């Protein structure tokens, strides 16, 4: 099995650099739209499982609706999410792991 993992931060923290131009709701909507695009690119490749790791329930709901595997993460730095996915992939004896940012 090969895994592509998509870490996505909590929507309340998404796209903060755009705060001068976009409201918190607009930034969250943008982050979800970008996740949808990344999921479009990652899902459906034979031999690859797509995982989404996030502390945000809304993100995980979008991922589950798209039939990606969801991995609930305790909110923290990106490195923590990647280490969590690395451990899970190793437990499943994955032959490859690709990390693709959710945005």
Per-segment meaning from a language model:
Residues 29-48:
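A short, N-terminal amphipathic alpha-helix
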């Amino acid at each position: 099995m090969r895994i592509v993992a998509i870490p996505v931060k909590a929507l309340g923290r998404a796209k903060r650099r755009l705060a001068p131009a976009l409201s918190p709701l607009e930034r969250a909507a943008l982050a979800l739209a970008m996740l949808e695009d990344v999921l479009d690119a990652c899902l459906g490749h034979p031999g690859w499982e797509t995982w989404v790791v996030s502390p945000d329930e809304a993100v995980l709901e979008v991922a589950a609706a798209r039939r990606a595997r969801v991995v609930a993460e305790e909110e923290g730095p990106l490195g923590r999410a990647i280490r969590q996915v690395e451990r899970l992939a190793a437990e499943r004896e994955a032959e490859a792991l690709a990390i693709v940012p959710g945005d």
